[in-house]
Amino acid sequence: MSGPTKLVFFGNEFPNDDLKALFRGLHRHGKDRRFRQLATFLEESTRVLQNEVAQLPEPLKKLVPHFENLMPLTEVDFRQGPLGAAMESALLTILELGMFIGHYEAEERVWDLSADRTTLAGLSIGLLAAAGVALSTHLAEVVQNGAECVRVSFRLGVYVHDISRKLEAPQADGSLLSWAHVVTGETASDLQEELSRYNTETGTPELLKVFISAADKTSVSVSGPPSRIRAAFRASQRLRYSKSLALPVYDGLCHAAHLYDEETIHRVLHPDGSVIPTSRPVQLALLSSRSGQPFEATTAAELFRAISTELLTGTIFLDNITAGILDRTERCADAPQCQIETYRTSLVFKGLLKALEACFPDRTISTTDLIPWVFQDYGARQPKSYADSKLAIVGMACRMPGGANDLDLFWELLAQGRDTHTTVPADRFDLETHYDPTGETENATRTPFGNFIDQPGLFDAGFFNMSPREAEQTDPMHRLALVTAYEALEMAGIVSGRTPSSNPKRIATFYGQASDDWRELNASQNIGTYAVPGGERAFANGRINYFFKFGGPSFNLDTACSSGLAAVQAACSALWAGEADTVLAGGLNIITDPDNYAGLGNGHFLSRTGQCKVWDQSADGYCRADGVGSVVIKRLEDAEADNDNILAVVLSAATNHSAEAISITHPHAGAQKENYTQVLHQAAVNPLDISYVELHGTGTQAGDAQEAESVLDIFAPRAHRRRADQPLHLGAVKSNIGHGEAAAGIASLLKVLLMYQKNEIPAHIGIPTVINPAIPTDLEQRQVYLPRTKTAWPRAAGQIRRAIVNSFGAHGGNTTLVLEDAPEKQVTVAREERSTHPVVISAKSKKSLAANVETLLAYLDENPETDLGDLSYTTCARRMHHSWRLATAVSDIPALQKFLRNAVSNDAVSQTRPIPTEAPHVVFTFTGQGAYYAGLAQGLFQALPFFRAEVRQLDHLSQRLGFPSIVPVILGEVEEGTATALVTQLSIVIVEIALARLWLLLLGIPAPHAVIGHSLGEYAALAVAGVLSTADALYLVGHRAQLIEEHCTPGSHAMLSVRATIADIERLVGTGADAPTYELSCQNTHQDTVIGGSIQDLNAIREKLEPEGIKCVNVDVPFAFHTAQMDAVRERLAKAVAAVPFKTPSVPVLSPLLGSVVFDGKSINPEYIVRATREPVRFATAIDAAQELGIVNSQTLWVDIGPHPICASFVRSLVPGARIVSSCRRNEDNFATMAKSLCTLHLAGRTPSWAEYFRPDEQAYSLLRLPKYRWNEVNYWIQYLGTWTLDKAHLKNGGSQKRTITDVPSVSSLRTSLIHQVTEETVDKTTATLKAISDIQHPDFLEAVHGHTMNNCGVATSSIWTDMAMTVGEHLYRRLVPGTDHVLMDLCDFEVQHAQVANTNSNTPQPLALEAHLDLPTRHMSLAWYDVNATTNQRADAPFATGSIKYPADPTGAAWSIEWSRITHLIQGRIEALQHLAAENKASTLSKPLAYALFKNVVDYAPRYRGMDRVVIHDHEAFSDITLTTDRHGTWHTPPHWIDSVSHLAGLVMNGSDASNTRDFFYVTPGCGSCRMTEPLIAGGKYRNYVRMFPMPDEAHMYAGDLYILREDKIIGVVEQLKFRRVPRLLMDRFFSPNKNAAAHAAPAPAPAAVPAVKKQPPTETIQPQAPKTEQKQDQLQLPNLASAAPSTANSSSSPSSSGVATPTTEQEAPVADASAVTGVAGKCLELIANETGLGVAELTADATFVQLGVDSLMSLVLSEKLRSEMGLEIKSSLFLECPTVGDLTGWLEQYC
């Protein structure tokens, strides 16, 4: 019985299922080894898309998220962007083929598609998916062919969008418009007739016409640019009233025969010259959607070409597809069954199915949906194996003992066979007191030896954005990790984001560290702010990630002595696992702590006789060593693609553990051998092919013997001996530089990497006597050697050297790496020689910039044969660029050397300034026709594929519009002066649009801030601004040129450039009847004018002007543009432009026609184009208008786009100081112009995309190993002082203990809403003491705090502390004087040093303590409030608020009443005066809502706090009427909301009066002198209060006043000396930001109620060093007094100290003598400081201290905010402490700002 016929139908739309769910299913199944073909297809498709995306221009690349699989692509809606068509086409192709492959694997189907009974069909992009099946004979071939289908789909989408957007730009608002509408009820022939009529009547160019793209019996699809379709449907009555629907086609035009041709198809299929393999035959019939017949293609190449041609040019005829399928089915007359496979259903498919059922009623027709399988679960499967890429080490850096502070010095040390061990230097610890060879002294070391880095404290803090204090507290090994990481990255040429593998989100760090000497010893002597981030291990590489903005994993590993190499192995694993694409790895060790010496010595690890004696008979332990090293590693394929220098290749790496050793610290040969075997198997390397082993080699008897056994058994076995030409060399770097512990492995690796570079093995110096007898004696017989002298290690031709690097940990870990030679670089790209190259140098400080210049000059002097192109590539594309910059464009090395020498000798560095923090705006200016010359932009066209492709694409569009090609003009094939106006003008506009895209898409210049075009150049400007589509711009330029050629006589009129104003011309030429006739054509500047007229008239004018000394130049154009000569074309041009759509500009357009700036979408219209041809070009007026609006200024960067920078001179004249770069220049090589322009942009802060500049022939350039960055170093070092590591051995639980508040039950019955737990209460006859704890997060307390919010955070007001004081005062008084009815109290000298802010985490306790002591004989009680650590219950040493209570001798209060009665009439008189002023509208009357609305300027009160009903205010005087709430809302002495209601009038006066500068300042109260009441406040009581505030004469910015509280016209309370301090409003956020992540132990943040007063100190006061204080909690803001703010004089030295900051005075320029000599940024900063402090600039002498100048902590905050807001400088307020003098500050500013 014959088999069934099969039809597989591939649609052109995604199924209705969730797209992400579909791809998630594919991705999930792709991890299952049951779906091997699917997995391979997904991997290949991902790789194809990665490669295609990598070829896109930089701005388009940025639209695509990083993806290692397809899932991220499904998360992005690409439809609104330029990659919509490309991504949707590619993803649809992947989805259909993936579902097809997965279905076969899920069903375990064998291939059953026979050529004679199988038909494939598809619609649109579905044809490409179908092609993957049509070319295959089994499933594996579908995988291979399918990847190529994905590639073509993507390219097709990119090209369609690119071409279509040149026909019509996208909407400015991002909305999607359809490029196709379906019309039902019309025939294709009728609609074609209607469309032809419409296109003809409107004069629509063929390129832009509306056309039919698809048709069947019942419907027709109409396609075209969206605006043209809409216009057609509006204009055509037939279309307007038809049944139509917009289709979801948003990315451009397909099926357009008038738009694409054979050359287009070729560019889609072979954009980079690649050729699709032609040997693959077509296996299955695939039907054309145009003819319904199988494509007449026999090979893959032919099939892809046929499909691409059909997609781009062929109309879809659905009826033909149906007919073809029916015909193919009918031919198999014996088939009883028809099986159809498709993806869900669609209208087209339903129609096809209906036709089949109708035609073949006797056949069984079945359908299979290829999608449902993806949602099924096929059981757990094992994942696929990990990637097996080789890895490339591309960068390295180090700091090693013996002065080896770079790689060259390290190699020099090794090559010379030096031993670096010495005794412990004094900067580590005092050897005399800490060394005892007898071992009798507890905690002393028994060995005095070690290997040490020279001055490990040297560090460039400013480079890494660290303050001196932070640098000092940061572990030196962490600092050197940063430094070596940078140097390794620099060597590797890593520039973040330059290539896919340098994506910062995919760069990881792995560092090994096994000790914490600095944190445990040096920094712990005075624990500071940066103790945790400066000392905890995780911050070593965490800081690297943070500084470089790396988003990959950050791991700090401790595997004891193998930590460094284990970190490298972990880094390699991350690369193999796909967790990162580039890794930094290394090891860190800096020795300072004698404890570790003692511990290792007592554990018998250390040698007492000196250096590590590896494999020596006298080996007695290891010698400790410093060391810091970093390496950069990538996958090999990435390194090769990135054109990196590969130092060596990592084949495999592994770590295991000596689990079977006899003790945890004893090595185990068996485990070591297992590890070797594992890495050799992974690398597929024969052990006999290893030619070098770098031993762990500690120099211990046990270690050497075990390692010798393991190495010899595996790499030189007796059973399989090495040949004589297979020697195995061994060595150990520890015999030179000691055992670096965590850095030992990285030191070994660096040594081997240097051996690869130098082709040499250093001598092994570890055997000073004789070889250890435990080592086998047959080494030579086994071809094993420990070279005792330098030994050559050459790389033979065609051979690869392989090496092993070992590192073992004392804890039992074994790490091994297998290395091999880097592959020899194959240069496959011929380099386009450029006449001129840019060279750039940069640094983060002036001093480093000067040093970098000097070192580069020295390098060139030593290497005069250096290739300039390679040098340019290295400095531009492969270096990180910093703010201090020098740049030049040169054509040879001698010219560069001259530039560098001049920079050094003329001190050019000191003249430079750092680039601005915010890059300047860019304006594009487009030149006109006068810039034309033959061969324009020829160099760029020939050398830059991107520019060439852009020109050819634009030229193709132009030709499709019916105009001639302009490429011959660019190639110089047209003689000068022979080109027509049409060709000339098209050449200029095409070149200008292509240049603009070159700047924007390739060279990385951002979208311009504005554009301006001069005459003809305005068409290019409008195209770039999106006003005109590219196609319309070319159409108008070409059509206008044709009209001019046809209707204007060339040579009859001309244009004359005159160096004079139009007024001067009129005056000199005259206006009489016999005066020559002329017209204004162009007003280029205020002194440059172009006039036009007949030749005769212009000659006559010239004869009049030149004798007057006025320069005149004929403009080289054949017509007089912008004159009456253009009148002949106006009407015809108006008709041509009428149908052209105009869009709202995407950037401002400086209009030379209107002399203004255009922002809207109506000003530029068809009439504008006609007027611009006839009317003058008012270039100067347009520029003036832009300057007036602030769109351009002296800081603006101008990019002149055109063949010659004609507009540049105009801009320079109009905009003083304008910076202009050119794109091309007549009679100058294009790359000479471009190089200079790129340098100018780079120096201005608009760093070009250097990578793209060199991309076309990057593989032909070499990355040079130039001198490393020269640091501006200072020695930040905290010296270990004393002998406390020895002394602690003798302490037996002694020493003082901090007073703590323990968590015990309350000892008193006192408990209120604010006092929660009394921990101590003692009472005797005359004194009483109470200590209590309260929790701000307690509901009652928290509600009180939130009644007074500032900057959205709850702040404890003074009324809270007042209630607590009165509560405790009354309680203790009654304990001493029982039976007292009413206790009168006077709260005196109340001052809040810093207020409390409620943490946002209410689940975390926020405790505080109150301590009170009452002395009855003196009738006085002292009060103090303290912060409390919630974790330890330990209270702070210093209180945050203090006060006292005085108890009057008269307990009735009569004395107070009498006192106040004497002034009551005065207060009443002032209240009446204010009422009178209010009646005359001279004082303000505020209602309650208005009063509290004013208060919101600073503080927002809860409703219960809003007691003031009415306020009358005049200047700083006011009274208010008050009604208290009727509810106490808690348990209080006096509710805080009542206290606030009767007292916060003073706050309103200061913060709401027009007499206060509330715009720049706000006012907060630090306390009062006295607060007393003769009677308690009553619920619902009505009161009146009065206050007048005065400035305090003895304290700047402080106000004080007395506030009176009256009830029924009687004074019942007074708050005396109520103070308010003025605070700059710019500090609002700094002071009053809520702490959202407060830790459990944290104390509250500050509030506006208590910015502390800064007490003035005598300027001559000697500031003494401060004792260590309790660490300031992260959410407090303590503004210290001057004495505590100023650093001690001992702290201002850069020599080792135990204090705090090492101020960099010795390494920087000496401070200037006086402020008047300071210029630049430093000078401006001093002017700002003088303005803010009220000092004269002359008073800011270099030796003046900021303490003496009155710059207190509050002023420091103000100055830092001012410097940020006004000068853009991010400067911490602590800088005024770290740079205590004006000279220190200016030195710092000159270096880093």
From Swiss-Prot:
Residues 1642-1659, 1683-1706 have a biased composition (Low complexity). Pfam families: Acyl_transf_1 (PF00698), CurL-like_PKS_C (PF22621), ketoacyl-synt (PF00109), Ketoacyl-synt_C (PF02801), PP-binding (PF00550), SAT (PF16073). SMART domains: PKS_AT, PKS_KS, PKS_PP. Residues 1482-1629 are annotated as: C-terminal hotdog fold. Pathway: Secondary metabolite biosynthesis. Residues 923-1245 are annotated as: Malonyl-CoA:ACP transacylase (MAT) domain. Residues 16-250 are annotated as: N-terminal acylcarrier protein transacylase domain (SAT). Binds 1 phosphopantetheine covalently. Keywords: Acyltransferase, Phosphopantetheine, Phosphoprotein, Transferase. The active site is at residues 561, 696, 739, 1348, 1540. Residues 1316-1452 are annotated as: N-terminal hotdog fold. It comes from the Eukaryota. Disulfide bonds: none annotated. NCBIfam families: PT_fungal_PKS (TIGR04532). Multidomain protein; including a starter unit:ACP transacylase (SAT) that selects the starter unit; a ketosynthase (KS) that catalyzes repeated decarboxylative condensation to elongate the polyketide backbone; a malonyl-CoA:ACP transacylase (MAT) that selects and transfers the extender unit malonyl-CoA; a product template (PT) domain that controls the immediate cyclization regioselectivity of the reactive polyketide backbone; and an acyl-carrier protein (ACP) that serves as the tether of the growing and completed polyketide via its phosphopantetheinyl arm. This is Non-reducing polyketide synthase adaA.
